[in-house]
Design a protein with these regions (language model features):
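Glycine-rich beta-strand-turn "strand-cap" elements at beta-sheet edges
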Residues: 1-5, 43-49, 77-99
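Active-site-flanking beta-strand signature of metal-NTP-handling nucleotidyl enzymes
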Residues: 5-11
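Short, surface-exposed ligand-recognition loops at beta-strand->loop->(often short) alpha-helix junctions
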Residues: 12-18
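Short, glycine- and small/hydrophobic-rich beta-strand elements in well-ordered beta-sheets
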Residues: 29-52
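An amphipathic, aromatic/His-enriched active-site/gating alpha helix that lines ligand/cofactor pockets
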Residues: 33-39, 58-92
Length: 99
């Protein structure tokens, strides 16, 4: 059984905070991809609305995700989400469909 954790996170930047949020998210990619247990952590921008960013994430297990959520840069983005985003961060967990 695959114990990997798949996540999708959506951030909608306040227009006046877009560049600040984008810079913070890019920094998170650089730091997170070095974490033990991070399988992938990809940042995308919506092709129709450049204020919307998405993370596609995969974690080796719950322990790796728990560690990630306690890092200073994740705690900082969670603390600042109401200032930087419209509607906060939308996070979905997914199960991979094997074909």
């Amino acid at each position: 059984m695959d114990q990997k954790i798949y996540m999708f996170a959506r951030f909608r930047a306040k227009p006046e905070k877009r560049e600040v949020l984008f810079s913070r998210l890019q920094e998170m990619v650089l730091l997170t991809n070095k974490e033990t247990g991070c399988v992938f952590y990809h940042l995308h921008v919506d092709s129709q609305n450049r204020d919307i960013f998405y993370f596609m994430e995969c974690w080796q297990n719950q322990e790796a995700l728990d560690f990630h959520m306690q890092t200073p840069y994740i705690q900082a983005i969670l603390r600042d989400e109401s200032d930087l985003t419209i509607g906060g961060i939308d996070i979905s967990f997914m199960d991979r469909v094997e074909i």
